[in-house]
Amino acid sequence: MRQKKNDKSSEGRLTNVSGDLLVRRFSVRQPEMFRVVEMVLAKKLTSIDKAALCELAQTAMDIEFDGLDGDFLQAGCGLGGAAIVIAHAKRRSRVFTVHDLSASELAAHGADERLNVQFVPGPYEETLALDGALALVHLDCGEYGPMRVLLERLAPRLVSGGHLIVDDYRTKEECRKAVDDYFRGKKGFQLIRKSRLHVIRN
């Protein structure tokens, strides 16, 4: 396991920049997606800040640009804001599954079968598949036990270059401990602290 700052850079990508600068650049380079981000915030569909949402959208778009194999997956969606952003950032052909108890806002904002989004109701600890490649995973879970289950089932499925994003790593101690315990001593993963923690498969 290695922790380092992200030093990857290429045209169109937003790396190594402050939150405000990231938002400004994203709004210019990706105006359509930026409007989705602003809509989600205006409707109060997420507690995630604007910079983190822009970073999430850019990560999904970078994965599409790189042509990585694998599905997108989110576990825990709250009011659905982050899932809506991911759904609009990805290509329509990419399968995106959302695991949570309910997700009433997703379909209302186009994040349904029209964008190849599949909602899987129920406790995600019980509904997650144990196989299948994943290119992007977004985890919104603050408790130790459920987070360990998510990591054990999902991290091994990441493709090379895939991202597992942990929303609550900085703010919730149980989440942080679960992540640190799981990845301690594990090879093949980079832990990069951006606005959220990104775990990238080598």
Range-by-range predicted roles:
Residues 1-23:
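N-terminal auxiliary segments of SAM/dcSAM-dependent transferases
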Residues 11, 50-53, 155:
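Generic N-terminal initiation segments characterized by hydrophobic and/or small/turn-forming residues
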Residues 19, 23-47, 66-202:
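S-adenosylmethionine/decaboxylated-SAM
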Residues 49, 53-56, 83:
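Short alpha-helical patches at coil-to-helix transitions and adjacent helical residues
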Residues 53-68:
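Conserved alpha-helix/loop element of class I SAM-dependent methyltransferases that forms part
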